[in-house]
Amino acid sequence: MDLPVGPGAAGPSNVPAFLTKLWTLVSDPDTDALICWSPSGNSFHVFDQGQFAKEVLPKYFKHNNMASFVRQLNMYGFRKVVHIEQGGLVKPERDDTEFQHPCFLRGQEQLLENIKRKVTSVSTLKSEDIKIRQDSVTKLLTDVQLMKGKQECMDSKLLAMKHENEALWREVASLRQKHAQQQKVVNKLIQFLISLVQSNRILGVKRKIPLMLNDSGSAHSMPKYSRQFSLEHVHGSGPYSAPSPAYSSSSLYAPDAVASSGPIISDITELAPASPMASPGGSIDERPLSSSPLVRVKEEPPSPPQSPRVEEASPGRPSSVDTLLSPTALIDSILRESEPAPASVTALTDARGHTDTEGRPPSPPPTSTPEKCLSVACLDKNELSDHLDAMDSNLDNLQTMLSSHGFSVDTSALLDLFSPSVTVPDMSLPDLDSSLASIQELLSPQEPPRPPEAENSSPDSGKQLVHYTAQPLFLLDPGSVDTGSNDLPVLFELGEGSYFSEGDGFAEDPTISLLTGSEPPKAKDPTVS
């Protein structure tokens, strides 16, 4: 309940009621014990806020809340004055609160008009600040549209690059798959070609077989790929012929069939009547082998290292004629001497006893005149042994060089090469002839190239088994075999081969023709028309 303001405290009518009541309350001397002016008159003090709220506030206001009174003072701009002694932690002995306002002064009531209540004023923006210029908006929209277009262009480019990247990855995967498959096929082809080269060169077979030229007590080892042959008589008559059953190849290597001083090749041909003459080199051993056909083995002492000689003996003349004989001359002499009569042909029969002959007329029976003997002198055993050792060393070096590359043949890989897993379009391979030639050139740098005629002439080229044993060559009586046989003697085959060329190496070393593994082209029989 508001108390009536005294006549001295009457103020202008535009002063708020709160300020008028506050002026009267502060100026009332009855309430100086609780509220009064400061000594300077610029502020007022409130003592004992609790008692002031209970006793004084209800008389002038409708409430007795000190907090509401302080809040109204703040609304009109009054500020609380804080002294130094009141700002510490120690509570002051007297509860004293001082408020001041620049226009609330003692004795100057007219200044109350200047005290205004604070109004929560929101700063009103000016219209020119709120209004945005149209050109700025247009420019902003243009920039936004431009940025949007650039973004769409970048998105399209990124999408195109993404598609291209996916296509490239798919192509890379396809190429990798094709490359792996092609590499697999190439590896299989290389392994297959290497296996062919290895089979042609007889790689991986290392033999250390004694020559057994001097050892007649031990039998030679049988060849790995041997077939049972038999030499059968056609004519049983003759000074050296004896009926005997067909013998196999095992009898050829019997210990008693090898002379103590080395094997001697002898040939018996039909000639005109001539008297035999003793040869100065030795005597003829006419011992027939057990179960063997007509064979003559001549024992002679080792000859000096020179070309073989032919000893032509006649019993009517005491002198002997020694002439240098090359294998070509020997074959030519045999061919010339066999012109009057059909040439001697070896009839080969297998283990079952079948003889391969043609329907040709047999040769006339041999006459009772003495026969002319042509014998090839024994080669020097040391020279032949050195030659075989050199060839063995060369083969070992070649095998070591080829094995150092670490080639391995996988049979399963070779079987998979022709399996249905590899389709026909995938087998588009390069030229196999050039690849095989290049691989052979790389694998065998030390081997001289052979002429193509020698390779094509042999049906079993590349499948021969080299056998380092000294085997005697047996030449049969021309009268004891059929002239219509398909197989010619060994010396007839050597006459037309490429082994005896015009070079010095071939003329001086006739053992090459005896040790080679491939067969030369067979000579045509001059007696067969």
Curated annotation (Swiss-Prot):
Post-translational modification: Phosphorylated. Phosphorylated in unstressed cells; this phosphorylation is constitutive and implicated in the repression of HSF1 transcriptional activity. Phosphorylated on Ser-121 by MAPKAPK2; this phosphorylation promotes interaction with HSP90 proteins and inhibits HSF1 homotrimerization, DNA-binding and transactivation activities. Phosphorylation on Ser-303 by GSK3B/GSK3-beta and on Ser-307 by MAPK3 within the regulatory domain is involved in the repression of HSF1 transcriptional activity and occurs in a RAF1-dependent manner.
Effect on the protein upon substituting T142A: Reduced promoter activity by about 90%. Almost no transcriptional activity when coexpressed with CK2
In-chain residues carrying the UniProt-annotated modification N6-acetyllysine: K80, K91, K118, K150, K188, K208, K298, K524
Single GO BP term: positive regulation of transcription by RNA polymerase II
Reported effect, S216E: Does not change interaction with XRCC5 and XRCC6. No change in spindle pole localization. Increases weakly PLK1-stimulated ubiquitinylation. No change in protein stability. Increased interaction with BTRC
Residue numbers of Phosphothreonine PTMs: T142, T323
Species of the source: Homo sapiens (Human)
Annotated effect of mutating L22A: Inhibits HSE DNA-binding activity and transcriptional activation
Residues recorded with modification N-acetylmethionine: M1
Consequence recorded when altering S216A: Does not change interaction with XRCC5 and XRCC6. No PLK1-induced phosphorylation in mitosis. Inhibits PLK1-stimulated ubiquitinylation. Increased protein stability
Stretch list, region Regulatory domain: 221-310
Cited PROSITE patterns: HSF_DOMAIN
GO cellular component, one term: mitotic spindle pole
Top-level taxon in the UniProt lineage: Eukaryota
Annotated protein name in UniProt: Heat shock factor protein 1
Effect of K80Q: Loss of nuclear stress bodies localization. Loss of DNA-binding and transcriptional activities upon heat shock. No change in homotrimerization upon heat shock
InterPro entries recorded: HSF_DNA-bd (IPR000232), Vert_HSTF_C (IPR010542), WH-like_DNA-bd_sf (IPR036388), WH_DNA-bd_sf (IPR036390)
Impact when changing T124A: No effect on binding HSE nor on transcriptional activity
Effect upon mutating S314A: Weak decreased PLK1-induced phosphorylation
Annotated segments matching region D domain: 203-224
MF GO annotations: chromatin DNA binding; DNA binding; DNA-binding transcription activator activity, RNA polymerase II-specific; DNA-binding transcription factor activity; DNA-binding transcription factor activity, RNA polymerase II-specific; DNA-binding transcription repressor activity, RNA polymerase II-specific; general transcription initiation factor binding; heat shock protein binding
Documented effect of changing S307A: No phosphorylation. Does not reduce Ser-303 phosphorylation. 1.5% increase in transcriptional activity on heat-treatment
Domain notes: In unstressed cells, spontaneous homotrimerization is inhibited. Intramolecular interactions between the hydrophobic repeat HR-A/B and HR-C regions are necessary to maintain HSF1 in the inactive, monomeric conformation. Furthermore, intramolecular interactions between the regulatory domain and the nonadjacent transactivation domain prevents transcriptional activation, a process that is relieved upon heat shock. The regulatory domain is necessary for full repression of the transcriptional activation domain in unstressed cells through its phosphorylation on Ser-303 and Ser-307.
Record note on what altering R296A does: No effect neither on repression of transcriptional activity at control temperature nor on transcriptional activation upon heat shock
Annotated stretches, region: Disordered: 295-324, 336-372, 444-463, 502-529
